């Protein structure tokens, strides 16, 4: 794992940690013992297999090199068990996130790092709870290009016209020389400026794929290094993917990554385009999700990251390809329980003395205060709980704080404070900063 640290003097240094991700395998003890000889790197440990479990189970822990090996090995184990003997865990969690969870780190945290025998010992001198936290000195540039279009729509075959690098109010325009000259001057400018954050519009879908293709056309792709590591821009064979969300088929471009730098494509991300960099930083810190991932994923993914963190810290395994169905309800229970779609018709006409009630994060607050989570409603350990679901009478756990309620707590508390400080702020920049942060947290709470 390569971790980039931004030092107080503005310089950046890479640290290499020999940490490796781990996957876990559950099943009957005899089946696990039969599997053990085929995987020399495995060992038995005790973990909770489900969030609602009260006793730990004996599972196999297997150290793998990377996410690709984790997926391959998981499929082999699943197939070896006839697709029924073994339960796989912690297979599809991004290794960067698991590294943060395992070391109690979060993006942009103020830390002290000490290399020890190939590993890194971390001392965190920061807290996700902080409101007025200090960010590292980050250099931000905006990258734009224009092409000599031969068609109405830009293509990778169009010749490069100009490259513009915007730093605050200054524009650096690269428009002279041949096309290879412009590309190499861009590489030189990045080395000289050494930006931490590169802002683009359509950087994932066009700018960086275009620059890569033009460099390849001129045989200089191996010199096209825009990141901090000596790695050239990459040509992706598969550009993006489609996915289904809320009744729509959507398309997301493959992220263009510049190793050691953060690339934010404002057309391929929601939080940064709606809440600015301050909102993006707040989500990454609070939800413990890498900045590059937070800038492109949905708000649900950020919320999931926070829940995964609490599960990992509680010793709960994360199932692979989770498909646990909702508990069965009869018709009457469904009518009483599922009221989310009910809309009350208003009375038409002109009304006077009308009042308005506005609840701040109503549903997330109810879920936190009433301890509503998948493993706490109708739990087996508290059948006589005084905390019940109205009308249905279902018991809610009194012994265990649910994963959902734990995750919502920090979001609700911080958003309330940001709204308070926003009202009290006297200068517009401070007020805007608090507003962007609370707005970002509001979006995360929407998907709870």
Regions from the PLM with identified roles:
Residues 53, 133, 155-157:
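Short glycine/proline-enriched loop/turn "hinge" motifs that connect secondary-structure elements
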Residues 63-67, 373:
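Charge-rich, low-complexity segments
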Residues 1-61:
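Long, charged/polar, low-complexity intrinsically disordered N-terminal extensions
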Residues 17-21, 31, 51, 66-68, ...:
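Structured beta->alpha junctions
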Residues 3-5, 25-28, 139, 151-448:
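Conserved acidic
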Residues 61-63, 355-356:
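Short, conserved beta-strand segments within well-ordered enzyme catalytic domains
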Residues 65, 72-145, 150:
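Long, highly charged low-complexity segments
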């Amino acid at each position: 794992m390569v971790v980039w640290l931004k030092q107080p003097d503005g310089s950046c240094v890479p640290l290499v940690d020999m940490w490796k991700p781990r996957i876990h395998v559950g099943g009957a003890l005899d089946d696990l013992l039969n599997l053990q000889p085929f995987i020399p790197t495995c060992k038995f440990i005790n973990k909770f297999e489900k969030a609602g479990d009260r006793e730990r189970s004996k599972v196999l822990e297997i150290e793998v090199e990377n996410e690709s090996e984790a997926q391959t090995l998981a499929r082999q184990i699943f197939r070896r068990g006839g697709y029924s003997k073994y339960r796989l865990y912690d297979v599809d969690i991004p290794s960067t996130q698991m590294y943060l969870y395992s070391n109690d780190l979060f993006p942009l945290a103020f830390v002290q790092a000490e290399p020890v025998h190939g590993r890194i010992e971390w001392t965190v001198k920061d807290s996700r709870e902080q409101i007025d936290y200090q960010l590292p000195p980050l250099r931000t540039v905006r990258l734009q290009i224009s092409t000599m279009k031969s068609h109405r729509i830009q293509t990778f075959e169009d010749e490069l016209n100009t490259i513009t690098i915007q730093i605050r109010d200054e524009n650096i325009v690269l428009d002279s020389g041949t096309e290879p000259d412009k590309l190499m001057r861009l590489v030189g400018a990045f080395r000289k400026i050494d930006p931490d954050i590169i802002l683009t519009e359509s950087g994932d879908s066009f700018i960086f794929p275009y620059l890569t293709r033009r460099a390849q056309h001129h045989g200089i792709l191996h010199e096209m290094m825009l990141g901090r590591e000596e790695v050239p821009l990459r040509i992706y064979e598969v550009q993006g993917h489609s996915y289904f969300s809320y009744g729509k088929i959507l398309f997301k471009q493959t992220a263009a990554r510049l190793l050691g730098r953060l690339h934010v494509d404002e057309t391929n991300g929601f939080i940064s385009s709606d809440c600015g960099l301050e909102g993006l930083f707040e989500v990454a810190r609070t939800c413990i999700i890498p900045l590059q991932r937070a800038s492109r994923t949905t708000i649900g993914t950020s919320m999931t990251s926070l829940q995964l963190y609490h599960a990992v810290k509680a010793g709960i395994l994360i199932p692979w390809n989770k498909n646990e169905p909702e508990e069965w309800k009869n018709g009457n229970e469904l009518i009483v329980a599922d009221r989310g779609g009910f809309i009350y018709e208003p009375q038409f006409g002109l009304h006077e003395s009308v009042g308005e009630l506005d609840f701040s994060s109503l549903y997330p607050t109810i879920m936190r205060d009433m301890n509503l989570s998948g493993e706490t409603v109708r739990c087996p350990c508290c059948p006589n709980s005084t905390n019940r679901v109205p009308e249905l009478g279902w018991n809610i756990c009194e012994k265990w704080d649910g994963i959902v309620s734990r995750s919502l707590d920090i979001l609700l508390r911080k958003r309330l404070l940001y709204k308070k400080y926003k009202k009290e702020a006297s200068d517009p920049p401070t007020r805007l900063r608090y507003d962007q942060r609370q707005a970002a947290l509001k979006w995360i709470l929407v998907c709870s």
